[in-house]
């Protein structure tokens, strides 16, 4: 999920390449990576974003499996980045449930519901 956020910034918002080593082996290192990713997202200057460019310019996603084209940054976000985030979030949720961690739907969807 960290890479998805990072690559959104570089592929869609055209920020300079950002290197995250992908070699974390402890929870502390993973927590530091999460903090670094949040810092990257917070560093985006919202006033410099060109909504038309994000909405209209194609995005090429270069991967080891080949290159993939999205018609726009909006398409990249809605058809790849958000579904990829939810895939990994639900996978982690299912693994935790399988291992007996006492979590439920409200732990996953807690921010969606506002009790009245």
Give the location of each predicted region.
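Aromatic-glycine hotspot motif
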Residues: 6-71, 96, 109-116
């Amino acid at each position: 999920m960290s890479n998805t956020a990072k690559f959104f910034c570089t592929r869609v918002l055209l920020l300079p390449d950002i290197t995250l080593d992908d070699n974390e082996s402890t929870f502390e290192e993973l927590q530091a990576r999460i903090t670094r990713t949040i810092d990257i997202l917070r560093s985006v200057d919202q006033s410099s974003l060109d909504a038309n460019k994000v909405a209209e310019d194609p995005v090429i996603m270069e991967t080891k499996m080949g290159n993939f084209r999205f018609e726009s940054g909006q398409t990249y976000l809605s058809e790849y980045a958000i579904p990829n985030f939810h895939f990994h979030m639900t996978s982690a949720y299912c693994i935790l449930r399988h291992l007996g961690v006492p979590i439920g739907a409200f732990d996953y969807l807690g921010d969606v519901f506002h009790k009245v």
